[in-house]
């Protein structure tokens, strides 16, 4: 019954922008919220000093949260007709 009320969500560049913004927000939030950073493997690229101790587990955790957040934001914006 709930699925019948959700609008058809097709991918558009604006949906992609919302997902990117939600992921950036989640990474920024996770940067300060994760208390035990740097316990797992690091990223294979050089990062600025701002992200010191931000490794693969932290990246996977924050982007997973960002995608969950984006799913809710996109659904809400689609339902409101703003997207």
Curated annotation (Swiss-Prot):
Residue intervals passing through the bilayer: 12-30, 68-83
Keyword annotations: Membrane, Photosynthesis, Photosystem I, Thylakoid, Transmembrane, Transmembrane helix
Entry GO CC: photosystem I; plasma membrane-derived thylakoid membrane
Membrane topology: Multi-pass membrane protein
InterPro entries: PSI_centre_PsaK_sf (IPR035982), PSI_PsaG/PsaK (IPR000549), PSI_PsaK (IPR017492), PSI_PsaK_bact (IPR037101)
Key word Iron-sulfur present: no
Propeptide feature ranges: 1-4
Keyword match Zinc-finger: no
GO biological process: photosynthesis
Localization of this protein: Cellular thylakoid membrane
Major subcellular location class: membrane
Family that this chain belongs to: Belongs to the PsaG/PsaK family.
HAMAP family attached to this UniProt entry: PSI_PsaK
Record's protein name: Photosystem I reaction center subunit PsaK
Source organism: Thermosynechococcus vestitus (strain NIES-2133 / IAM M-273 / BP-1)
């Amino acid at each position: 019954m709930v699925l019948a009320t959700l609008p058809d969500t097709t991918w558009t560049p604006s949906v992609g922008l919302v997902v990117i913004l939600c992921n950036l927000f989640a990474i920024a939030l996770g940067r300060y919220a994760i208390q035990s950073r740097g316990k797992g493997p690091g990223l294979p690229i050089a990062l600025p000093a701002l992200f010191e101790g931000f490794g693969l587990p932290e990246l996977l955790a924050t982007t997973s949260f960002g995608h969950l957040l984006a799913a809710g934001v996109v659904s809400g914006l689609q339902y409101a007709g703003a997207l």
